[in-house]
Amino acid sequence: MSALTRLILVVSLVAVTTAPAAHAAERMWMGFHDDPVLRWDAGRIDELDAAAQTNATIVRTFVTWANAAPRRPANPSNPFDPAYMLDDVDELVRNAQNRGMEVLITIWGTPRWANGGRTPNYVPTNMTELRRFAQALSARYSGRYPGYPFVRFYGIWNESNLARFLAPQFDARGEIVAPRNYAKLAAAAYAGIKAGSPRSLVAIGETSSHGRDKQVPKLSDSTSPGTFARLLAEANPRLQFDAYAHHPYPYPVFFKPTQLVRWPNVSLKSLPRLERSLSTWFRRDNIPIWITEYGHETKPGEPLGVTEAQQADYLPQAVALAKRDRRVEMFVWFVFRDSLGSSWQSGLYRRNGTRKPALARWASTAPPVDARNPSLSARGGQRAPDVNLTTREICATNGEGTAVGMTYRARLAGKLVKVGQIQTRLRSDCSITVRPAFTVAPGKRYVIQFDLNTENGVSLRRTVTIAGSGRG
Protein backbone atom coordinates (compact mmCIF):
# COMPACT_ATOMS: atom_id res chain seq x y z
CA MET A 1 0.00 0.00 0.00
CA SER A 2 3.11 2.21 0.07
CA ALA A 3 2.34 5.62 1.53
CA LEU A 4 -1.39 5.07 1.70
CA THR A 5 -2.74 5.32 5.22
CA ARG A 6 -5.44 3.24 6.76
CA LEU A 7 -8.99 4.09 5.67
CA ILE A 8 -12.33 2.46 6.01
CA LEU A 9 -14.64 3.01 3.17
CA VAL A 10 -18.04 4.56 3.11
CA VAL A 11 -19.92 2.05 1.04
CA SER A 12 -22.97 3.42 -0.75
CA LEU A 13 -24.99 1.73 -3.45
CA VAL A 14 -22.64 -1.22 -3.38
CA ALA A 15 -23.45 -3.85 -5.98
CA VAL A 16 -21.90 -7.05 -7.18
CA THR A 17 -21.92 -6.42 -10.89
CA THR A 18 -22.08 -10.09 -11.80
CA ALA A 19 -25.33 -10.81 -9.94
CA PRO A 20 -28.18 -8.71 -8.55
CA ALA A 21 -28.65 -8.22 -4.83
CA ALA A 22 -30.75 -11.04 -3.45
CA HIS A 23 -32.61 -9.04 -0.81
CA ALA A 24 -32.28 -5.37 -1.63
CA ALA A 25 -34.47 -4.27 1.27
CA GLU A 26 -31.98 -5.72 3.73
CA ARG A 27 -30.45 -2.28 3.26
CA MET A 28 -32.17 1.07 2.73
CA TRP A 29 -31.11 4.68 2.57
CA MET A 30 -32.61 6.19 5.74
CA GLY A 31 -32.64 9.88 6.52
CA PHE A 32 -34.60 13.09 6.82
CA HIS A 33 -36.27 15.86 4.86
CA ASP A 34 -36.25 19.10 6.83
CA ASP A 35 -35.16 22.14 4.83
CA PRO A 36 -36.05 24.69 7.56
CA VAL A 37 -33.76 22.92 10.05
CA LEU A 38 -31.06 21.17 7.99
CA ARG A 39 -30.67 23.77 5.23
CA TRP A 40 -31.72 27.22 6.48
CA ASP A 41 -31.56 27.24 10.28
CA ALA A 42 -28.74 29.24 11.87
CA GLY A 43 -27.74 26.06 13.70
CA ARG A 44 -27.91 23.84 10.60
CA ILE A 45 -24.36 22.52 11.02
CA ASP A 46 -25.14 21.23 14.50
CA GLU A 47 -28.45 19.85 13.25
CA LEU A 48 -26.73 17.93 10.45
CA ASP A 49 -24.20 16.61 12.95
CA ALA A 50 -27.09 15.40 15.10
CA ALA A 51 -28.75 13.77 12.08
CA ALA A 52 -25.53 11.98 11.18
CA GLN A 53 -25.19 10.77 14.77
CA THR A 54 -28.60 9.10 14.46
CA ASN A 55 -27.12 7.03 11.60
CA ALA A 56 -28.93 8.96 8.87
CA THR A 57 -27.46 8.16 5.46
CA ILE A 58 -29.45 10.53 3.22
CA VAL A 59 -30.93 14.03 3.24
CA ARG A 60 -33.81 14.98 0.97
CA THR A 61 -34.21 18.59 -0.11
CA PHE A 62 -36.41 20.63 -2.43
CA VAL A 63 -34.96 22.65 -5.26
CA THR A 64 -37.84 24.92 -6.16
CA TRP A 65 -37.22 26.01 -9.72
CA ALA A 66 -39.12 29.26 -9.15
CA ASN A 67 -36.72 30.20 -6.34
CA ALA A 68 -33.58 28.92 -8.03
CA ALA A 69 -34.33 30.87 -11.23
CA PRO A 70 -36.63 33.83 -10.43
CA ARG A 71 -35.58 35.34 -13.77
CA ARG A 72 -34.83 33.44 -16.96
CA PRO A 73 -31.13 32.60 -17.31
CA ALA A 74 -29.32 33.79 -20.40
CA ASN A 75 -28.05 30.24 -20.89
CA PRO A 76 -30.46 27.92 -19.04
CA SER A 77 -28.36 24.78 -19.62
CA ASN A 78 -25.28 26.37 -18.04
CA PRO A 79 -24.99 25.07 -14.45
CA PHE A 80 -23.31 28.30 -13.40
CA ASP A 81 -25.43 30.87 -15.19
CA PRO A 82 -25.47 33.98 -12.94
CA ALA A 83 -29.28 33.88 -12.77
CA TYR A 84 -29.24 30.65 -10.76
CA MET A 85 -29.55 31.09 -6.98
CA LEU A 86 -28.31 27.83 -5.51
CA ASP A 87 -25.83 28.81 -2.81
CA ASP A 88 -27.86 27.22 -0.01
CA VAL A 89 -28.20 23.99 -2.01
CA ASP A 90 -24.44 23.98 -2.64
CA GLU A 91 -23.83 24.30 1.08
CA LEU A 92 -26.23 21.52 2.01
CA VAL A 93 -24.74 19.13 -0.54
CA ARG A 94 -21.23 19.83 0.77
CA ASN A 95 -22.29 19.54 4.39
CA ALA A 96 -24.06 16.24 3.75
CA GLN A 97 -21.06 14.80 1.92
CA ASN A 98 -18.73 15.79 4.75
CA ARG A 99 -20.89 13.64 7.04
CA GLY A 100 -21.05 10.65 4.73
CA MET A 101 -24.66 11.27 3.67
CA GLU A 102 -26.18 11.12 0.21
CA VAL A 103 -28.57 13.80 -1.06
CA LEU A 104 -31.92 13.42 -2.81
CA ILE A 105 -32.97 16.53 -4.71
CA THR A 106 -36.65 16.84 -5.57
CA ILE A 107 -37.23 19.39 -8.33
CA TRP A 108 -40.54 21.20 -8.39
CA GLY A 109 -42.20 24.64 -8.79
CA THR A 110 -42.33 26.54 -12.08
CA PRO A 111 -41.12 30.18 -12.27
CA ARG A 112 -43.66 32.76 -13.38
CA TRP A 113 -41.60 33.53 -16.46
CA ALA A 114 -41.94 29.88 -17.57
CA ASN A 115 -45.69 29.32 -17.10
CA GLY A 116 -47.35 32.54 -18.16
CA GLY A 117 -47.23 34.30 -14.80
CA ARG A 118 -49.00 31.59 -12.83
CA THR A 119 -48.17 30.12 -9.43
CA PRO A 120 -45.41 27.46 -9.12
CA ASN A 121 -47.86 24.54 -9.14
CA TYR A 122 -48.69 25.11 -12.82
CA VAL A 123 -46.56 23.33 -15.42
CA PRO A 124 -44.29 25.21 -17.82
CA THR A 125 -45.78 26.30 -21.11
CA ASN A 126 -42.66 24.93 -22.83
CA MET A 127 -41.21 21.74 -21.33
CA THR A 128 -37.85 22.52 -22.92
CA GLU A 129 -37.36 25.14 -20.20
CA LEU A 130 -37.72 22.48 -17.50
CA ARG A 131 -35.40 20.11 -19.33
CA ARG A 132 -32.72 22.80 -19.53
CA PHE A 133 -33.05 23.65 -15.84
CA ALA A 134 -32.89 19.99 -14.83
CA GLN A 135 -29.81 19.55 -17.00
CA ALA A 136 -28.09 22.57 -15.47
CA LEU A 137 -28.89 21.44 -11.94
CA SER A 138 -27.71 17.87 -12.36
CA ALA A 139 -24.59 18.98 -14.25
CA ARG A 140 -23.73 21.30 -11.36
CA TYR A 141 -23.80 18.26 -9.05
CA SER A 142 -22.38 15.73 -11.52
CA GLY A 143 -19.02 15.51 -9.76
CA ARG A 144 -17.25 17.13 -12.70
CA TYR A 145 -16.71 20.48 -10.96
CA PRO A 146 -14.42 20.82 -7.91
CA GLY A 147 -16.33 22.01 -4.85
CA TYR A 148 -19.69 20.81 -6.17
CA PRO A 149 -20.25 17.24 -4.95
CA PHE A 150 -21.95 14.54 -6.94
CA VAL A 151 -25.67 14.11 -6.19
CA ARG A 152 -26.87 10.59 -6.81
CA PHE A 153 -30.66 10.82 -6.33
CA TYR A 154 -33.32 13.02 -7.91
CA GLY A 155 -37.11 13.17 -7.69
CA ILE A 156 -39.43 14.88 -10.14
CA TRP A 157 -41.99 17.23 -8.61
CA ASN A 158 -43.67 16.77 -5.23
CA GLU A 159 -47.05 15.19 -4.49
CA SER A 160 -48.22 15.74 -8.03
CA ASN A 161 -51.58 14.18 -7.23
CA LEU A 162 -52.42 17.27 -5.15
CA ALA A 163 -53.45 20.61 -6.67
CA ARG A 164 -51.27 22.35 -4.10
CA PHE A 165 -48.26 21.11 -6.07
CA LEU A 166 -49.65 20.38 -9.55
CA ALA A 167 -52.63 22.17 -11.07
CA PRO A 168 -55.03 21.64 -12.56
CA GLN A 169 -55.98 18.17 -11.33
CA PHE A 170 -59.24 18.25 -13.35
CA ASP A 171 -60.42 19.89 -16.54
CA ALA A 172 -63.64 21.89 -16.97
CA ARG A 173 -65.63 18.66 -17.42
CA GLY A 174 -64.28 17.19 -14.19
CA GLU A 175 -61.97 14.72 -15.94
CA ILE A 176 -58.62 13.98 -14.31
CA VAL A 177 -55.81 15.64 -16.30
CA ALA A 178 -52.91 15.95 -13.84
CA PRO A 179 -51.30 12.57 -14.72
CA ARG A 180 -51.24 13.46 -18.40
CA ASN A 181 -49.56 16.79 -17.66
CA TYR A 182 -47.16 15.11 -15.26
CA ALA A 183 -46.13 12.59 -17.91
CA LYS A 184 -44.82 15.44 -20.06
CA LEU A 185 -43.20 17.14 -17.10
CA ALA A 186 -41.50 13.92 -15.93
CA ALA A 187 -40.19 13.08 -19.40
CA ALA A 188 -38.63 16.52 -19.77
CA ALA A 189 -37.05 16.53 -16.31
CA TYR A 190 -35.73 12.98 -16.65
CA ALA A 191 -34.09 13.79 -19.99
CA GLY A 192 -32.48 16.89 -18.53
CA ILE A 193 -31.19 15.20 -15.38
CA LYS A 194 -29.65 12.33 -17.32
CA ALA A 195 -28.09 14.70 -19.86
CA GLY A 196 -26.38 16.62 -17.06
CA SER A 197 -25.45 13.64 -14.89
CA PRO A 198 -25.83 10.23 -16.57
CA ARG A 199 -24.94 8.29 -13.41
CA SER A 200 -27.70 9.84 -11.34
CA LEU A 201 -30.87 7.94 -10.42
CA VAL A 202 -34.27 9.54 -11.00
CA ALA A 203 -37.63 8.79 -9.40
CA ILE A 204 -41.03 9.80 -10.69
CA GLY A 205 -44.30 9.91 -8.79
CA GLU A 206 -43.52 11.45 -5.40
CA THR A 207 -47.24 10.95 -4.74
CA SER A 208 -49.20 11.76 -1.60
CA SER A 209 -50.84 8.85 0.22
CA HIS A 210 -54.42 9.86 -0.54
CA GLY A 211 -56.71 11.75 -2.91
CA ARG A 212 -60.38 11.95 -3.92
CA ASP A 213 -60.52 11.44 -7.72
CA LYS A 214 -63.36 13.93 -7.93
CA GLN A 215 -63.91 17.59 -7.27
CA VAL A 216 -65.44 18.50 -3.93
CA PRO A 217 -66.68 22.06 -3.30
CA LYS A 218 -64.47 24.09 -0.94
CA LEU A 219 -61.77 21.37 -0.87
CA SER A 220 -58.49 21.40 -2.77
CA ASP A 221 -58.51 19.09 -5.78
CA SER A 222 -56.64 15.79 -5.53
CA THR A 223 -56.22 12.44 -7.25
CA SER A 224 -55.64 9.18 -5.42
CA PRO A 225 -52.09 7.82 -5.85
CA GLY A 226 -53.28 4.57 -7.43
CA THR A 227 -55.43 6.36 -9.99
CA PHE A 228 -52.67 8.88 -10.66
CA ALA A 229 -50.12 6.14 -11.39
CA ARG A 230 -52.53 4.21 -13.62
CA LEU A 231 -53.40 7.27 -15.71
CA LEU A 232 -49.74 8.27 -15.84
CA ALA A 233 -48.86 4.91 -17.38
CA GLU A 234 -51.74 5.25 -19.83
CA ALA A 235 -50.45 8.68 -20.85
CA ASN A 236 -46.93 7.36 -21.46
CA PRO A 237 -46.35 3.62 -20.86
CA ARG A 238 -42.75 4.04 -22.03
CA LEU A 239 -41.95 6.81 -19.56
CA GLN A 240 -38.35 6.47 -18.40
CA PHE A 241 -37.47 6.39 -14.70
CA ASP A 242 -35.21 4.55 -12.26
CA ALA A 243 -37.62 4.34 -9.32
CA TYR A 244 -41.14 5.24 -8.25
CA ALA A 245 -41.42 7.50 -5.19
CA HIS A 246 -44.35 7.61 -2.80
CA HIS A 247 -45.31 9.21 0.53
CA PRO A 248 -47.31 6.52 2.38
CA TYR A 249 -48.31 8.71 5.33
CA PRO A 250 -50.96 7.42 7.71
CA TYR A 251 -54.28 9.09 6.91
CA PRO A 252 -55.99 10.11 9.08
CA VAL A 253 -52.86 11.08 10.97
CA PHE A 254 -53.64 8.90 14.00
CA PHE A 255 -53.59 5.66 11.98
CA LYS A 256 -50.97 2.99 12.70
CA PRO A 257 -48.33 2.04 10.10
CA THR A 258 -50.08 -1.31 9.69
CA GLN A 259 -53.44 0.28 8.88
CA LEU A 260 -54.89 -0.67 5.50
CA VAL A 261 -56.66 2.06 3.56
CA ARG A 262 -59.21 1.89 0.77
CA TRP A 263 -57.57 1.47 -2.64
CA PRO A 264 -56.64 3.47 -4.72
CA ASN A 265 -55.21 5.33 -1.71
CA VAL A 266 -51.87 3.80 -0.71
CA SER A 267 -50.47 3.37 2.79
CA LEU A 268 -47.34 1.53 3.90
CA LYS A 269 -49.37 -1.65 4.29
CA SER A 270 -50.73 -1.43 0.75
CA LEU A 271 -47.43 -0.67 -1.00
CA PRO A 272 -47.23 -4.23 -2.42
CA ARG A 273 -50.48 -3.69 -4.32
CA LEU A 274 -49.14 -0.44 -5.77
CA GLU A 275 -45.94 -2.23 -6.79
CA ARG A 276 -47.81 -5.03 -8.55
CA SER A 277 -49.96 -2.46 -10.30
CA LEU A 278 -46.96 -0.42 -11.42
CA SER A 279 -45.40 -3.54 -12.92
CA THR A 280 -48.60 -4.21 -14.85
CA TRP A 281 -49.22 -0.65 -15.97
CA PHE A 282 -45.64 0.14 -17.02
CA ARG A 283 -44.89 -3.45 -18.11
CA ARG A 284 -41.74 -3.51 -16.00
CA ASP A 285 -40.82 -5.96 -13.26
CA ASN A 286 -39.28 -5.09 -9.91
CA ILE A 287 -39.63 -1.31 -10.07
CA PRO A 288 -37.63 0.13 -7.14
CA ILE A 289 -39.66 2.07 -4.58
CA TRP A 290 -38.42 5.14 -2.74
CA ILE A 291 -40.34 6.25 0.34
CA THR A 292 -39.33 9.90 0.14
CA GLU A 293 -41.62 11.15 2.92
CA TYR A 294 -43.10 9.43 5.95
CA GLY A 295 -43.81 10.40 9.55
CA HIS A 296 -46.19 10.41 12.50
CA GLU A 297 -47.27 13.78 13.89
CA THR A 298 -47.48 14.12 17.65
CA LYS A 299 -49.71 15.91 20.11
CA PRO A 300 -50.14 18.61 21.32
CA GLY A 301 -48.85 20.39 18.21
CA GLU A 302 -51.13 18.23 16.06
CA PRO A 303 -54.36 17.72 18.04
CA LEU A 304 -55.31 14.66 15.97
CA GLY A 305 -51.82 13.21 16.12
CA VAL A 306 -50.41 10.37 18.17
CA THR A 307 -48.71 10.59 21.53
CA GLU A 308 -44.94 10.75 21.64
CA ALA A 309 -44.91 7.24 23.08
CA GLN A 310 -47.02 6.00 20.16
CA GLN A 311 -44.69 7.72 17.69
CA ALA A 312 -41.78 5.85 19.28
CA ASP A 313 -43.67 2.55 18.88
CA TYR A 314 -44.80 3.25 15.32
CA LEU A 315 -41.41 4.29 13.92
CA PRO A 316 -39.73 0.84 14.07
CA GLN A 317 -42.98 -0.76 12.88
CA ALA A 318 -42.92 1.47 9.79
CA VAL A 319 -39.27 0.71 9.08
CA ALA A 320 -39.93 -3.01 9.51
CA LEU A 321 -42.77 -2.86 6.98
CA ALA A 322 -40.50 -1.12 4.49
CA LYS A 323 -37.64 -3.52 5.16
CA ARG A 324 -39.83 -6.54 4.46
CA ASP A 325 -40.51 -5.18 0.98
CA ARG A 326 -37.56 -6.08 -1.22
CA ARG A 327 -38.33 -3.26 -3.66
CA VAL A 328 -38.01 -0.45 -1.10
CA GLU A 329 -34.60 1.21 -1.37
CA MET A 330 -35.16 4.41 0.59
CA PHE A 331 -37.00 5.61 3.70
CA VAL A 332 -37.08 9.36 4.43
CA TRP A 333 -38.65 10.70 7.62
CA PHE A 334 -40.37 14.09 7.52
CA VAL A 335 -39.20 16.08 9.63
CA PHE A 336 -36.05 15.99 11.81
CA ARG A 337 -37.06 18.63 14.39
CA ASP A 338 -40.34 20.43 15.01
CA SER A 339 -39.81 24.11 14.21
CA LEU A 340 -41.59 27.35 13.50
CA GLY A 341 -40.50 26.92 9.89
CA SER A 342 -42.66 23.81 9.47
CA SER A 343 -46.33 23.15 10.13
CA TRP A 344 -45.54 19.49 10.82
CA GLN A 345 -45.06 18.04 14.30
CA SER A 346 -43.47 14.75 13.23
CA GLY A 347 -39.90 15.59 14.24
CA LEU A 348 -37.78 13.40 16.45
CA TYR A 349 -36.85 16.52 18.40
CA ARG A 350 -39.26 19.02 19.93
CA ARG A 351 -39.12 22.70 19.01
CA ASN A 352 -36.99 23.44 22.08
CA GLY A 353 -34.40 20.91 20.93
CA THR A 354 -35.19 18.22 23.48
CA ARG A 355 -35.50 14.65 22.31
CA LYS A 356 -38.72 12.77 21.72
CA PRO A 357 -38.69 9.06 22.61
CA ALA A 358 -38.77 8.17 18.89
CA LEU A 359 -35.22 9.47 18.42
CA ALA A 360 -33.72 6.54 20.30
CA ARG A 361 -35.83 4.12 18.27
CA TRP A 362 -34.57 5.65 15.03
CA ALA A 363 -30.96 5.51 16.22
CA SER A 364 -31.29 1.80 16.98
CA THR A 365 -33.37 0.97 13.89
CA ALA A 366 -31.21 2.65 11.24
CA PRO A 367 -27.79 0.90 11.62
CA PRO A 368 -28.91 -2.64 10.68
CA VAL A 369 -30.25 -1.38 7.34
CA ASP A 370 -27.41 1.06 6.59
CA ALA A 371 -26.99 1.08 2.80
CA ARG A 372 -23.32 1.93 3.25
CA ASN A 373 -22.89 -1.58 4.67
CA PRO A 374 -24.57 -3.45 1.84
CA SER A 375 -25.84 -6.99 1.57
CA LEU A 376 -25.25 -8.55 -1.86
CA SER A 377 -25.36 -11.82 -3.73
CA ALA A 378 -22.86 -13.38 -6.12
CA ARG A 379 -22.90 -16.53 -8.19
CA GLY A 380 -21.71 -19.54 -6.24
CA GLY A 381 -18.23 -20.56 -7.39
CA GLN A 382 -17.37 -17.10 -8.65
CA ARG A 383 -13.88 -15.84 -7.89
CA ALA A 384 -13.08 -12.19 -7.14
CA PRO A 385 -16.52 -10.70 -7.78
CA ASP A 386 -16.58 -7.06 -8.86
CA VAL A 387 -18.01 -4.91 -6.09
CA ASN A 388 -18.90 -1.27 -6.70
CA LEU A 389 -18.57 0.92 -3.63
CA THR A 390 -19.27 4.60 -3.15
CA THR A 391 -16.79 6.43 -0.97
CA ARG A 392 -18.65 9.59 -0.06
CA GLU A 393 -16.34 10.99 2.62
CA ILE A 394 -13.30 10.46 0.43
CA CYS A 395 -14.84 12.86 -2.10
CA ALA A 396 -15.02 15.56 0.57
CA THR A 397 -11.26 16.09 0.36
CA ASN A 398 -10.24 14.21 -2.79
CA GLY A 399 -11.00 14.47 -6.48
CA GLU A 400 -11.56 12.08 -9.34
CA GLY A 401 -8.60 9.79 -9.91
CA THR A 402 -7.41 9.82 -6.30
CA ALA A 403 -5.69 6.57 -5.29
CA VAL A 404 -7.70 4.65 -2.70
CA GLY A 405 -6.05 1.79 -0.88
CA MET A 406 -7.58 -0.76 1.43
CA THR A 407 -7.09 -3.85 3.48
CA TYR A 408 -10.00 -6.27 3.51
CA ARG A 409 -10.76 -9.23 5.73
CA ALA A 410 -13.31 -11.83 4.65
CA ARG A 411 -14.91 -14.07 7.26
CA LEU A 412 -17.15 -17.11 6.97
CA ALA A 413 -19.11 -18.00 10.11
CA GLY A 414 -16.70 -15.79 12.05
CA LYS A 415 -13.60 -17.55 10.72
CA LEU A 416 -11.07 -15.47 8.80
CA VAL A 417 -10.76 -16.94 5.29
CA LYS A 418 -8.98 -14.18 3.37
CA VAL A 419 -6.93 -11.05 4.00
CA GLY A 420 -5.96 -8.91 1.06
CA GLN A 421 -5.00 -5.46 -0.14
CA ILE A 422 -6.33 -3.51 -3.11
CA GLN A 423 -5.56 -0.15 -4.64
CA THR A 424 -7.98 1.55 -7.03
CA ARG A 425 -9.01 5.00 -8.27
CA LEU A 426 -11.86 7.26 -7.20
CA ARG A 427 -14.51 8.05 -9.82
CA SER A 428 -16.36 11.35 -10.17
CA ASP A 429 -19.51 9.86 -8.64
CA CYS A 430 -17.62 8.98 -5.43
CA SER A 431 -17.47 5.30 -6.29
CA ILE A 432 -14.73 2.72 -6.72
CA THR A 433 -14.67 -0.87 -7.94
CA VAL A 434 -12.91 -3.54 -5.90
CA ARG A 435 -12.39 -7.27 -6.44
CA PRO A 436 -11.74 -9.10 -3.17
CA ALA A 437 -9.67 -12.13 -4.18
CA PHE A 438 -11.59 -15.08 -2.82
CA THR A 439 -14.04 -17.60 -4.23
CA VAL A 440 -17.68 -17.29 -3.22
CA ALA A 441 -18.93 -20.75 -2.28
CA PRO A 442 -22.56 -21.65 -3.09
CA GLY A 443 -24.90 -21.28 -0.13
CA LYS A 444 -22.32 -19.49 2.01
CA ARG A 445 -22.53 -16.01 3.50
CA TYR A 446 -19.38 -13.94 3.86
CA VAL A 447 -18.80 -10.80 5.89
CA ILE A 448 -16.04 -8.57 4.51
CA GLN A 449 -14.60 -5.66 6.44
CA PHE A 450 -12.98 -2.96 4.32
CA ASP A 451 -10.43 -0.58 5.83
CA LEU A 452 -9.70 2.08 3.23
CA ASN A 453 -7.16 4.86 3.13
CA THR A 454 -5.97 7.81 1.09
CA GLU A 455 -2.65 9.64 1.10
CA ASN A 456 -4.24 12.66 2.79
CA GLY A 457 -5.34 10.55 5.75
CA VAL A 458 -9.03 9.85 5.22
CA SER A 459 -9.99 6.76 7.23
CA LEU A 460 -13.31 4.90 7.21
CA ARG A 461 -14.75 1.44 7.84
CA ARG A 462 -17.68 -0.36 6.28
CA THR A 463 -18.82 -3.98 6.24
CA VAL A 464 -20.16 -5.81 3.19
CA THR A 465 -22.10 -9.08 3.24
CA ILE A 466 -21.92 -11.34 0.17
CA ALA A 467 -24.11 -14.43 -0.15
CA GLY A 468 -23.24 -17.15 -2.64
CA SER A 469 -26.19 -18.29 -4.73
CA GLY A 470 -26.92 -21.98 -5.18
CA ARG A 471 -26.62 -24.86 -2.78
CA GLY A 472 -23.45 -25.59 -0.85
Task: Tell where the protein language model's regions lie, with residue ranges.
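Noncatalytic carbohydrate-binding groove/subsite architecture in carbohydrate-active enzymes
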Residues: D41-I45, R131-Y145, F150-R152, R173-A309
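Enriched for extracellular/lumenal, surface-exposed ectodomains of secreted and cell-surface proteins
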Residues: I448-V458
